[in-house]
Amino acid sequence: MTLSSEDREAWLARWREGRTHFHLDQVHPTLMRYIDQTPLGGRILVPLCGKSLDLGWLNDQGYEVVGVELSEQAVSELFEQLEVEPIRTRDGPFEIWQSPGLSVYVGDIFELTANSVGTFDTIWDRAALIALNPTDRARYAPHVSSFLKKDSTVLLSVLVLSLIHI
């Protein structure tokens, strides 16, 4: 099951219209704080990566980084920020943008399979879980977990909200 056409279009529209307030202009502090909990040089999956500076930073730290992002615009902006000219290939429904140690799959995270990308030592989920439509969250966790090696690590940044009833 893939993302609905409405969810796809809403996400792509956010990027087209510049409604990306969630994007940080720095490496995420939580990632920097906890990266030492992961195997150095391991493979890291970054779902719904956008144009996050985390990908370049992780690559610079010696990790093999694989991102997944629906918006080609976001991926293009990422590689522009990194000042890297990617090699672009196609694998099934995905266009893959690659540079040494970094690959970004442009397409629907729910169409990604371990057969195409392999398995990972770590998943860094900065905001993918909260970016998804609530109806997709229940299937997201088991889906991305299927990419994990045994004894792997998930770094998950979440928001804690207090609900006040009036």
State the predicted function of each range.
Residues 41-50:
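Conserved class I S-adenosyl-L-methionine
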Residues 1-40, 82-112:
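S-adenosyl-L-methionine
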Residues 151-159:
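Conserved beta-strand signature within the Rossmann-like core of class I S-adenosyl-L-methionine
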Residues 71-72:
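Conserved SAM/SAH-binding beta-strand->alpha-helix loop
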Residues 165-166:
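Conserved small/polar residues in nucleotide/adenosyl-binding loops
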